[in-house]
């Protein structure tokens, strides 16, 4: 890896980049520092341990069902004209999304570090149900923390998490409040492990989650070379905190000819409409008041991309102009869902349909040998009630 590689990751203090424009860091109180240092040390030791990495690889294959397919969306390609479109089918993983890649890695890490029980937060409920499944597999108790607003609309994931043995705790609000509560609880008990669900929060969480999710991009490279004889010309994915998209593009950060496009929800587009600030242990782009005293944010139909900030890696890549970030409205997301369902027979989660909405806009203008890979990071069961409410009549 070259010195100026974008894949070098954060420095020892958790910063991506240098100087006053660096993103990330460890902006937390002294009470949290010992736990973060312990976690970072445990992570660095684990990724040098072949036995640990082999165990992770074993369960990725035999428990999650990896590698997930790289699927040629032939009907959609013909419908749109132009680019040849592929889906990285993360929705076919056990528990229905990319989230389990990270849950498995961090639960194995917690087990290696001798932790007795687990904490996690979730917005769409997908991280909670995935972590609950892995916790059940390895016999560790789990407390899942979610905002009461999100719980009301993703009840299927909540039911699954309970079936796996998780205890659910509701806090007023959405994902932001759930993360805050999970971190606060973690600081009170050294026997606990906080399983962070995205590339957010204080160092080393963004680094750990990006490492776990980078399996997505490594598979994309291998599968695209095998199937098409070349790597994708473009990779596109949705961005809330940003873990699935980070995983999809991490392998390609030094491939300057690969166009990378992250798509936020229009109502909560921190990279498009936010400013830099410090919140939840990290410096990043945030939707915040003018004085930075409080966070702001709207509502999105995709609970997993309804986040007032974004992971610091994405803020850094945005400022470096290494990745393009844009946004999609709820109406565009719903339209993309209808198109994918009709032409490919796939009921997707709403979150990746933000990326699909942008893909639908641009694919027709690309040549036929231009390969676009969409990270289809979740399945749609959790959103069926919302979909029926908003567009149910369109299918009659």
Annotate the PLM regions:
Residues 256-263, 268, 358-396:
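Catalytic phosphate/nucleotide-handling subdomain of diverse soluble enzymes
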Residues 117-119, 127-183, 270-279, 383-392:
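Active-site-proximal loop->helix
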